[in-house]
Amino acid sequence: VSRLNDLIRQVGRKDEVLASDLQREVAALADRRSFGLNFERHVPEAVELPGRPVRRGDKVRILPPRGQARTAADERLWRVTRTSAGEAEVEVAPLDDDSDDARTTVTREDLVVVAEFRDPIYPGLVSTGTVERGGDKPFHTVINAENYHALQALLFTHRGKVDAIYIDPPYNSGARDWKYNNDYVEGDDLYRHSKWLAMMERRLLLAKELLNPDDSVLIVTIDEKEYLRLGLLLEQVLPDAKIQMISTVINPTGAVRGSSFARSDEYIFIASYGVTGAPRVSRSWSKDGHATSSAAPAEPYWRNLRRSGSNSLRSDRPNLYYALRVDPSTGRVSTDGPGDEVLPIRPDGKDGYWQVSAAALPSLLGAGFVRSRRHRGEWIIQYLATGEQAKVAAGDFVEEGREENGALVLRGVTADLTVATTQWATPSHSARHHGAVLLKALIGDRSFPFPKSLYAVEDVLRFFVADKPEATILDFFAGSGTTAHAAMRLNRQDGGRRRSISVTNNEVSADEQRTLRDGGYRPDDPDWEALGICEYVTKPRITAAITGRTPKGDLVTGDYKFTDEFQMADGLEENVEFFTLTYEAPLQVASHRAFERIAPLLWLRAGARGGRIDDVSDGWDVAETYGVLADLDGAGPFVEAVAGAPGLQLAFIVTDEDRLFEAVVRELPDHVEPVRLYESYLRTFELSTGGSTR
């Protein structure tokens, strides 16, 4: 190796870029393990960024004429050497030949920017829509992005703060199901395992930085094609984690593959930090799919007495709109007693209706099946529905007394719980019945290959976030959005405020790409992007789950099954915002000219709840959970506003001066975390580009 280093130094005197590339390759070879998992991790990985504006210094590819397929020559990398605002053409030079003779002029529309994963990026976010039915709950987030770059962005917002990561990466089947360096990885590619491992390692190294090091879990599903290599990779990337593997039946009838055994299961790797207590389920779980995946006893589910979801307006059931009374001293609910008046008003301010008639309510009150709770100054009325009442009658819940408001105090019985095994075979995990069929009910005939069972994802997450009602859950291979959907269902079951972050690209299937290309379309054309997975599947599925309506506006047909059974048309009381990742110029960021795209990252770092500060043209602003000081002349009123906001956690201060930053920090309340902009932002992305991307 020393002789190679001498030769590289000689090369560097003539070509520094070539010498740097050679040094990186030699370092990768020298870093190989004597034992363990060795693979070609030094193979460079790059991604095209359609729609990203072309700037001087960018790496680009020249696109073939519209309607023509790409050839090997089109994969050549070029660098933009000259560009002017308003000009349709730019000058480019081959990355491997910077001579004047090699330079050429190309129209902007025939170029696509390329980012190699060893290059620093400076991400922002642009909102592409919201669905709000969750009142003051935190927002779930869906990000349309290359997931490696999205993970880098999340280092700024969520480093060490994620409670659970669930991913279902490509299985590397050879069936054109994933790309490396913009090309599908075929089954006969001799390096397909190395490419898959290199792709996974880069992302797992970033994911490790996002997990809470004291108490968190990484869950990865995989099949037989890569499970052996994935297990070794997890041991190398996460040496301090406790790692187990579960075999779970997802296709009870089995998939016949030639002369092989019919394949009926896949594998779940669970890598956990600080998790204590054995995960438990009901003894009947494998038979009926009703999960109680918690070491704690099952608790009764108190539903909101006000109807939610579709058909929840007063006009739908006018006879169920009536006033209740709550005694403020005891919380006792009645239809005609003293106290505060409570009406079934929806989160959007419109009149709704109760789920029980005025005539039937007194019997539920007498049985202790109705209770009141105070939340943010308002009364919420809850009740036990028929299914929960039956569990009380069957002895699944033991009465320990009554609250002052007359409601039963119930304790779950733990006698039927047992430690979950590493072999799962429950009807609720069928990928066809509770993945594909359920997805079709939500979004119709929009196709998506191999969606997970909603209840399978829900069950495995429940083991680790049942006792974390405000958990942050990340899925950076989000696909159709099953993980976000599962997190929302968990919230409904226990009144939680968990938030999910779903990352998916907007890749179009291989067949659709061919058809679109033959029609003269390119990536970033509206007709092309409309068929991408994020726009065509993920966003519509999550929207349908919340609203209870399909993309066509029809009510979703069918019912949710197992642990929490209700009509899918009811929807879910949740909030979600959809974003697309942008690529910013560092000088624009540093000079405060990209704040509109950086603003969503600040909001995410503050918990994705409450209002977002998108404009600080007045010098400063304060929202529920964070504040931004852009002009230090306003430091006095800013500090006063921060001190008067009890829920505020973060203060972002825009300054290049250490002394001025420290002066503002000294005036802030002790519980408020100060963050300096844009130093903290820029430094995050300069440091996140390193060994993991070689």
Spans of model-derived segments:
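Accessory, often C-terminal, charged low-complexity segments
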Residues: 1-134, 138-140, 155-159, 163, ...
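Conserved helicase NTPase motor core
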Residues: 135-167, 171-173, 177
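Short, glycine/acidic-enriched loop or turn micro-motifs at the edges of active sites
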Residues: 149, 171, 226, 478, ...
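Conserved proline-anchored active-site loop of SAM-dependent methyltransferases
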Residues: 160-179, 234, 473-487, 598
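Active-site-adjacent bridging/hinge elements
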Residues: 173-182, 424-439
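Aromatic- and acidic-residue-enriched carbohydrate-binding clefts of CAZyme catalytic domains
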Residues: 175-191, 511
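Glycine-rich S-adenosyl-L-methionine
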Residues: 187-206
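Conserved SAM-binding loop and adjacent beta-strand
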Residues: 443-455
